[in-house]
Amino acid sequence: MDYKETLLLPETNFPMRGNLPQNEPQRLKSWYEERKVYEKMKKNRQNAVKNFNIHDGPPYANGHLHIGHALNKILKDIITKTHYFYGENVRYVPGWDCHGLPIEQQVEVKLGDKKKELSKVEIRELCRQHAREFIDIQRDEFKTLGIIGDFENPYMTMKFEFEADIYKALCEIAKKGLLVERSKPVYWSWAARSALAEAEVEYEEKEDYSIYVAFELDGDALEKLGVKEASAVIWTTTPWTLPANQAISLKPDEIYVLTAENLIFAKPLLESVVQSGLSKGEIKKEFKSSLLENTHAINPLNGRKSKFLLGDHVMMDGGTGLVHTAPGHGEDDYYVCLKYGFSEILMPVDDGGCYDESIKHHGLFRSDVVDEFVGMHIFKANEKILELLGKSLLSVSKFRHSYPFCWRTHKPVIYRATKQWFIAMDESKLGGKTLRQTALKELEKVKFYPSVGIKRIGSMIENRPDWCISRQRDWGVPIAFFRDKATKEVIFDSEILDHIAGIFKEKGADAWWALSIDELLPKGSKYKAENLEKVMDILDVWFDSGSTWHAVLQSDNYDAGKYPASMYLEGSDQHRGWFQSSLLVSTAINSHAPYESILTHGFTVDAKGEKMSKSKGNVIAPQDVAKTHGVEILRLWVGMSDYSSDLKISEDILKQISEQYRKIRNTIRFLLANVNDLESLNTEFNILDKWILARAKKVFDEASACFKNYDFSKGFNILLNFLSADLSGVYLDVCKDRLYCDAKDAPRRRSAQSAMAIITKTLLPLIAPTLTYTVDEVMDYAPKIIKGEAKDAFDLVYEPIKFDLSFEDELLFASREKFNEIVDVLKKDKKIKSTLELSLETTNHNITSYDEREVADLYMVSSVRAYDDSEPLAEFELEGDKFKIIASNLHKCPRCWKFNASKEDALCPRCEEVISAK
């Protein structure tokens, strides 16, 4: 007789292979088009006690997604869904940053010379079209990653009402007195012809000159020193700024020396000066820096006087202790000259980084050579300036150092004093506090993941300068203020500001360029159009993104959740970017941080830890991963990676993740297949079921705690170890006999099935935030005992295992491990083919007191009994108890294959009973 037909073999239609690249797109379509799962999620939790929202840091609407985008959006999705599957009401509104230089440059490249023929409004419309095109592309790419959010109504900084909200935020800051316009050296990208904020500057290696230049002392300085000849020696790495030199800064209260060569240096630096060969170190005279204050030296390049000043910015860690001071090209230089009341700041460089006509008017070069320098790029002028210095150039060399570059053009930037708009950090306008003080105080209330984040952003806020928010470009929200032509005073009239905001909401910010001043003024305004002019600068895009909380979280245009947001989540570079700009705008307006918590992740790198680049051929594109492995593999990679540092990804790493996914999927499939006929849960459990449920409860509780703390890699490590070692490695294996061979309703079988059902029901919502595609697929095949009334994955809620079970017998499992080691040797020596041929005897009374069938299943032998004098195949001892492995003296049952039958080809008593009952 073929007994196979009498066995209760596992049965499920849940496929062994996921075929993820083929199946995921269909499921995604059903989520968004048929089931409307985001709306369903909102409805399911409408009465929830807790609320959670991540405010999306907007990606730039330019280009396709890269793996860093995928990491960021998947992590946001996992965290949002984690809160959802814990029963919380969640909101996630994706957004896009639409204005700014990269899009404008793309449009300029397409236009070429045609740009000159177009108006600013026409150029802006082309920029808008470009952004719209890539928003549509990126929206589909984000959704493909399994991201669930309000993609039907995302926020875009170029929407008319959004531009109006950005402008309103600017006006609120202006009304608080925190917006100031002044000339000041700022980072200037000559390649982009615009000012830059700190966040738009990156540091790269650059080769520069290192020069020492002698400035002869003028008569007043020589008189103070009581000498007839002396020169102040300055050190600089920017020869091109020497024409604009206006002063030489000395350290207050420091001792300076005049050497035998009639050169002046700071005394603490004399030793290093000697080593550099500038002097032999013989001192003729010592004096305090204050002696030269307000006296003069002569600039050897142009003969102009250079005043000696005292400045705290002068350091004794290099150079000569005499600092070349050009206030038009350096922030420290600017402030020290401001302190000394300089009425004129020289800045002879135009927007494109070339010397302008002012070098003639101010005599910044000798008259016989000045024409040669007009229109010359400053970096090309360095060599010619060195030639002109002649004998005054004491030393010249080249060196490499870290230098600021424009993040968009990747060209070196300069400091350039221009008239710009700033948000003041140190004006006491917020209830007697400054913006810097308020922002730092608010940071103390924010929870950081990882916790070191507060130190990073805190030190940046402490040390940052005023925020330069103006740009000299076309594609952005205008700083839409009027200026009185006669007085040059800026008009901050509430009626006008509100009226312009209303126009922007209706027509967009293009109206600032499209409409005349008369058309932009409210009817009946006391101001006359002919007396006004427009401010034509636009806002820094960091102000756009920094005010998104204002336009999204405090607006009726979006259902985006609360303000402040539960979380902001971006890469660690955003401490100096979006986290900071958002904090400053929010505290300037509301004296409140816009977020309750900040989570940062590292960057994606290849398997060697190197940055990805096309030239290296190590780029992993999310679109390629989706096509070859499936999005679920990418999501599991995010879940299993420690995002607090840089995340490695490569084809080999993805294959390893795929293998882990296969184990998870096959484990779930086995569980589904073996509970297919279970209709109700048992509450009485056998010892092995108690053991696995106790282990599952402990593991799920630990993993859940990790997930709640956003430590996903640790949580998955705990889970996968349990699924592999305890569940698949032990329990599911030892349960097969009772699942397949016991009677359908046998208590032992129903006990095992109940344990499996409980584990599956608990596991699914625990992994659903990460493996959403898979869990949703599981729900299509899960029996009612697992899914209950849930129609799909989005109806699940995580509930911990409630059974307070415990089963501990370390010796039982330790003896099993030792038994398996010995059995492996017996199999290799071909003494046995299967452990079912064996019986086990032991002196341990605990083990023999358990249900004999349970213990036999654990060892996967035919029987376990008390120790006697049987002849052993092998034996071992543990903790004083003896164990003897013997060959069974009974026969193999043709149905269950256990050696418990009384004679050849006969059924064992258990199988006989099951067959008879049928």
Curated annotation (Swiss-Prot):
Keyword Aminoacyl-tRNA synthetase assigned: yes
Cofactor: Zn(2+)
Organism superkingdom: Bacteria
Renumbered ranges of motif 'KMSKS' region: 611-615
Residues spanned by motif 'HIGH' region: 59-69
GO MF annotation terms: aminoacyl-tRNA deacylase activity; ATP binding; isoleucine-tRNA ligase activity; tRNA binding; zinc ion binding
Entry domain remark: IleRS has two distinct active sites: one for aminoacylation and one for editing. The misactivated valine is translocated from the active site to the editing site, which sterically excludes the correctly activated isoleucine. The single editing site contains two valyl binding pockets, one specific for each substrate (Val-AMP or Val-tRNA(Ile)).
Subunit relationships: Monomer.
PANTHER family xrefs: ISOLEUCINE--TRNA LIGASE, MITOCHONDRIAL, SOLEUCYL-TRNA SYNTHETASE
The protein's name in its UniProt record: Isoleucine--tRNA ligase
